[in-house]
C-alpha cells in the first residue's frame, strides 16, 4: 500500500486517542514512547502491505486501522497482551468523536437499496480476487432494506495480521464489530469468524426499530 494522505489520516485521527488509553494502562512516559515507535512501525507496515485497491475500496480503511493496531502492539514490545491491546483499541476508537459521526453516516446509507445494490456488486467483484490481500465476500439481501447480511470468505484484516506475526489480535478486533453496530443503530448477529478458525464470517445486520 502507499503511505499516502489516506494512510496518514488514519494515524492522525486515532493516535491521540490511543495515546490517552495507553497512559491509563502504561503510564505517560511509556505511552509517549510507545506512540513514537508506533509511527515508525505503522509506516513500515503500510508500505510492505499489498494494496487492496486504495481509496477506491471502502475496506482499505479497515486494513489501515488493523495496520495501526498492529503497530501499537509491536511498539509496546510485550507490555500489552492481545486482550489488553483489544481493549485499548476498542476504547480508543469508541472515544473518537469522528468515529461516532462516521458510523451514524454509515447507518443512513447502509440501510438503503442503492447502497445494498452497490455492495452486492462489490461482493461479486471480490470473487475475481484482483487483490489477493483483500476481502472476498457475498452480499445477502434481507426481506426489507432494514436488514442485510455480508458473508466474508476471506478477510483482509486477518491476512495483514498473519503477515505481521500478530494473528492473535484478529479475534480481539472482531469484537469491535459489535461496538460499530451499536453506533449504527442496529443489531449484529454473527455465529462464525475466520479469526476464530471458522471457514467464514457470517454478519447479519438488522436496523433497530
Predicted segments with their positions:
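N-terminal, charged low-complexity regulatory/assembly segments
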Residues: 1-76
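Generic structural marker for isolated residues within well-ordered, non-membrane alpha-helices
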Residues: 19, 157, 177
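Hydrophobic, Leu/Ile/Phe/Ala-enriched alpha-helical segments that form helix-helix packing faces
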Residues: 22, 72, 76, 127-128, ...
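Short coil/loop linkers at secondary-structure junctions
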Residues: 29, 79-83, 167, 187
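Short, flexible segments with low predicted structural confidence
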Residues: 44, 152-154, 174-175
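Conserved aromatic-histidine-acidic binding/catalytic patches
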Residues: 56-64, 161, 165, 169, ...
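Amphipathic interaction/junction segments at domain boundaries or subunit interfaces
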Residues: 64-70, 74-164
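C-terminal structured interaction module
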Residues: 171-209
Amino acid at each position: 500500500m502507499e503511505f499516502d494522505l489516506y494512510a496518514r489520516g488514519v494515524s492522525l485521527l486515532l493516535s491521540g486517542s490511543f495515546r490517552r488509553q495507553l497512559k491509563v494502562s502504561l503510564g505517560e512516559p511509556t505511552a509517549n514512547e510507545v506512540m513514537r515507535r508506533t509511527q515508525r512501525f505503522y509506516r513500515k507496515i503500510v508500505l510492505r502491505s499489498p494494496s487492496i485497491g486504495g481509496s477506491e475500496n471502502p475496506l482499505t480503511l479497515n486494513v489501515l486501522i488493523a495496520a495501526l493496531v498492529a503497530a501499537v502492539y509491536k511498539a509496546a514490545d510485550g507490555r500489552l497482551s492481545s486482550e489488553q491491546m483489544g481493549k485499548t483499541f476498542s476504547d480508543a476508537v469508541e472515544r473518537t468523536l469522528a468515529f461516532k459521526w462516521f458510523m451514524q453516516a454509515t447507518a443512513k446509507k447502509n440501510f438503503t437499496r442503492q447502497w445494498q445494490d452497490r455492495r452486492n456488486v462489490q461482493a461479486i467483484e471480490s470473487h475475481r480476487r484482483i487483490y489477493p490481500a483483500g476481502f472476498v465476500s457475498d452480499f445477502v439481501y434481507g426481506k426489507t432494506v432494514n436488514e442485510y447480511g455480508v458473508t466474508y470468505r476471506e478477510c483482509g484484516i486477518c491476512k495483514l495480521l498473519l503477515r505481521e506475526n500478530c494473528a492473535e489480535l484478529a479475534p480481539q478486533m472482531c469484537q469491535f464489530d459489535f461496538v460499530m453496530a451499536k453506533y449504527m443503530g442496529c443489531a449484529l448477529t454473527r455465529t462464525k469468524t475466520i479469526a476464530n478458525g471458522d471457514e467464514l464470517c457470517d454478519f447479519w445486520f438488522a436496523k433497530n426499530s
